[in-house]
């Protein structure tokens, strides 16, 4: 059995694959260069190369401008929301799947149920209240979801890889609350660390969390718009709502639309006015590194 | 007689009701599992990331229960251990993963390769499971929710169906909605911070779906960090999440939720969660672990002792006391 966990510091790794690295991996190691090292950064914190986690967190945080309630899991969505609280959306509140609202954690939480989220929180709800009143009642502006696969309508698979649900080649964790987040949030943001044709697929192996178009095909109208933003290591895909496909609307500096289309398993549409994403600024990186995640629990 | 009855002077103090005898439902873990968990039973084990009744799961393994149907929203390490212990033939769940820390080796072998034997699996979403408990607790025939429209899950789970609302929808049109069936486990087991000897169970922090799961069940076992005096419970009755009449056994089992946590008692053992992917990946290593930590220990006290005080010191938490509220009293 492993050494004791500590609530105040990142844990000693017990396996290289899951260990937070002491030194951040550079974006160039697992993604495109962002030009951040020779960008407008001036602060000392920003001289280090930008990691893919930092890049995705910063880009996601900017998308939260004007939003009030965010349903988020731990990891990049937490970082993005915490950064947004310090920048574009000071009033934004995270609702955690564990039932915590208005958390004021003393340390960066390691899970959605970390004890530090509960101590000092404004409210802790039961599961019927969280899923029934808060989510299904329509109180969430933005839900963050991840998935193993996404298709052009923003339908998500988090259940199985393979042809058969009952004998899959890989059994994934399954729906959890993702179906509820998808059906009931006003809109859904998806963060994908790796933009590949296997994950951005023409046909899902299994549709766990359906977007509104699939629901409407069954004659049932869901509350929300489904996935409206997909933030990846290559750029941003977006759709406004029912009847719209995800389109490429922005790329990171140095990434071409053709690169993104080649990394997408369907015939990806590209917006006429394709934007270039501004690299993380010195101020955003400083806040992320010094205030949001100084222990580099997630910024690996 | 009422307050307006002229025979009772307004100033007379109301007679104190006769004290009701308090049942003592405290049992050892061994006796509680022996009495309330039988081969072939449907057993709900709840606790949403917090207060997971791991020690009860271990005792079920020690006593060699077979052919259980386990009902649990987040089927995590304790379920993987019960699978490795050969106790489970069917799983009803909405999340089959080791938190966000990795995989459940035994569960994946059972589902992906039917090794060492197939596992019957009935899958819902989290709120689908919550609604099954809500329907079960209220003895309703089904419970509606807006989750499944367009999902492939309904095509692999016959329990997920639709009904047409008898009332027109917001647009005046006929409205169809998905429903899930009630679940009424033979027994529900939950873990809590404290209870009195009768089973009035107090939980703070994440309260999850414990009350619904207990009320849905025919029998309920509550495992607690400590059994407290009646007066402690009665000093703060709103803290009672499960009343005594819904509880059949109270088991004192300190640190019985490890590797999950008990708010205010000990922290989550995150390192253990991360190590489970490695332990459970190799069936031989997993069986060695089960032999050493579950089958090789007489009870949970031995498991706790084997972890060692140094380990527990690393999971210790400091105080963060709530301010008392004033319930008031009649003068």
Question: Residue spans of the language-model regions?
Answer:
Chain A
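Intrinsically disordered, low-complexity terminal tails and inter-domain linkers enriched
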Residues: 2-47
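Structural signal for hydrophobic packing residues in well-ordered secondary-structure cores
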Residues: 64, 68, 84, 88, ...
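A conserved C-terminal secondary-structure "cap"
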Residues: 272-300
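Residue-level recognition of conserved structural "scaffold" positions that shape functional pockets
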Residues: 22, 38, 80-82, 161
